[in-house]
Amino acid sequence: MKGEVKKVVLAYSGGLDTSIILRWLQDQYQCEVVTFTADLGQGEELEPARAKARLMGIKEENIFIDDLREEFVRDFVFPMFRANALYEGVYLLGTSIARPLISKRQIEIANMVGADAVSHGATGKGNDQVRFEMGYYALKPDIKVIAPWRLWDLTSRTKLLDFAEKHQIPIAKDKRGEAPYSTDANLLHISYEGKALEDPWVEPFEDMYTRSVAPENAPDKPTYIEIEFEKGDAVAIDGVRLSPAALLTKLNELGGANGIGRLDLVENRFVGMKSRGVYETPGGSVLIVAHRAMESLTLDRGESHLKDELMPRYAELIYNGFWFAPERIAIQTMIDKVSENVSGTVRLKLFKGVASVVGRKSPKSLYRMDYVTFEEDSVYDQRDAQGFIKLNALRMRLAKMARG
């Protein structure tokens, strides 16, 4: 492998697995390694990643730690929420939507430093390998991709730990007795997968959850909040305007405190197998309820129903790694156009695991009380309904007459 690659940009968390990958790249390719660590709001201190990269011989100018929280929410999470995207009807795509931003920034760094390759720590069984690499190739078609989990012989946790000890890679004390699941986190969600959770019959441990209280332990008094929208995006909570990242952070706090946002599902991976995942998405779970309520007031029936028809396809594209695909961009263009009228305020009640809409208002509301009232009105002639019904029933009447 020596000489195949001159410089590689590694998506680096600073954890054990990507530190092993870093050393493996140095050994196998004898190339210059550039580390990239993204702050997506995972709630971890990232400076230790810089220290560990230095310890492993990475030059200071080759260490990138970027705060991408605002870009993540503004340019990836919010556009996705304009579509009300749910994969297989329930999953808010917290992991899926983070991957294209990481890929994008990796390629930007590769262009900056003149790297001819990129590398990631996703395994050969999961969706993330697809998501990362789809992004790489979409943005830089001639880039070389190194996926160590598909190449090396470190096929067990024991072999990984032995490799780390042999190469003097620091091993955290808890790594020999690891948590009985793996996690992935960002500002939108945290996921728990694998190990003890692989059996879909096993109930998740209560002490596993970090972003929400159990619904039954949530406060006995509901929390009322108001979310203001402009052109499909949330911009304020209770009248206080916030940046995209700050707003999602606040919704996470409010939703989590009221036991909202837990999800346990078995999903269909793009690579063909099913997997069981447990997720906490408190802020996102509140936001999607509020957004749909705002749309119900401001979108025409045809617009709304067309969006609902396209949503499963849109969500599947994101889940499968096609964020940069032309069809995803085309659907997004339609969604963004429709969202220009989605402005106003939604009032919600957060109570013991449920976010309920209790009020909505908009300067662009299509709801007309003078038309819908059960009292006497002067704008709607109920006699018009007779011809409307007859015309819509005509094809069924003809079918019955012809077929009996």
Swiss-Prot record:
GO cellular component terms given for this protein: cytoplasm
Keyword Amino-acid biosynthesis: yes
Subcellular locations according to the entry: Cytoplasm
SUPFAM superfamilies, A to Z: Adenine nucleotide alpha hydrolases-like, Argininosuccinate synthetase, C-terminal domain
UniProt-annotated binding residues for L-aspartate: 123, 127-128
Binding-site positions, L-citrulline: 91, 96, 127, 131, 182, 191, 267, 279
Transmembrane feature ranges: none
Enzyme class: ligase
UniProt keyword Kinase present: no
Residues at which ATP binds: 11-19, 38, 121
Biological processes per GO annotation: argininosuccinate metabolic process; L-arginine biosynthetic process; urea cycle
Family: Belongs to the argininosuccinate synthase family. Type 1 subfamily.
Protein name, entry field: Argininosuccinate synthase
Organism: Paramagnetospirillum magneticum (strain ATCC 700264 / AMB-1)
Biological classification of the source: Bacteria, Pseudomonadati, Pseudomonadota, Alphaproteobacteria, Rhodospirillales
Gene designation per UniProt: argG
